[in-house]
């Protein structure tokens, strides 16, 4: 396992060296770091080990990225979709098209603004975990927006498919100057502050935010 958080244009060759050393059967990565490595390989004609398969996640895999990555590694790349609460939710099959949901242990739905189930149109992702007996999550809203496909896959797998991950809902803090700050600021702001066991943030007006 190698961290991509320290990756930059000056050390991409170090990641390639590690791939060539370990010769993994499968390479699992965030989409963008693997895409950046692939561009470096193709632009500099670098020799790199070719895994049997490449698995990407954490963000959408666009077709131009798929082409670049597969050219660099001479391997097929399959995108996945998941979140911390459920891990792998859906994944591409050999057809590399829509994402098959893991319906053997997850119920994946999308709801419209009236909390009605929708198929073939974008909605809020809600998930029920059928295997989590420690902390059951029932119709859990994970903040993502997606479109569940109306069609079946030609691969023969009967599991339902997600046609597209359309985006994500986030809490945003708006400042007096009009700047918009992601709500994720606060967890990162306080995570290293050991004297604080818990905290809560609330907004009364645009110019006033209380943390207690």
Predicted regions and their residues:
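Active-site glycine/GP-rich loop and adjacent strand/helix microenvironment
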Residues: 1-212
């Amino acid at each position: 396992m190698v961290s991509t958080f320290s990756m930059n244009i000056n050390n991409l060759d170090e990641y390639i060296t590690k791939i060539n050393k370990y010769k993994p059967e499968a390479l699992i990565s965030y989409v963008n770091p693997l895409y950046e490595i692939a561009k470096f390989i193709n632009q500099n004609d670098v020799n790199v080990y070719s895994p049997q398969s490449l698995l990407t996640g954490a963000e959408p895999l666009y077709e131009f990225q798929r082409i670049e990555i597969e050219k660099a590694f001479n391997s097929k790349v399959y995108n996945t979709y998941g979140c911390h609460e459920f891990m792998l939710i859906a994944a591409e099959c050999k057809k590399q098209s829509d994402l098959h949901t893991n319906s053997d242990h997850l119920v994946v739905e999308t709801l419209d603004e009236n909390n009605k189930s929708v198929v073939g149109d974008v909605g809020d992702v809600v998930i029920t975990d059928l295997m989590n007996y420690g902390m059951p999550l029932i119709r859990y809203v994970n903040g993502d927006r997606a479109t569940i496909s109306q069609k079946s896959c030609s691969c023969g797998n009967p599991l339902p498919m997600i046609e597209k991950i359309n985006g994500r809902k986030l809490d945003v803090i708006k400042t007096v100057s009009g700047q918009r700050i992601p709500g994720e600021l606060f967890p990162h702001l306080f995570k290293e502050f050991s004297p604080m066991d818990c905290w809560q943030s609330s907004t009364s007006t645009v110019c006033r935010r209380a943390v207690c």
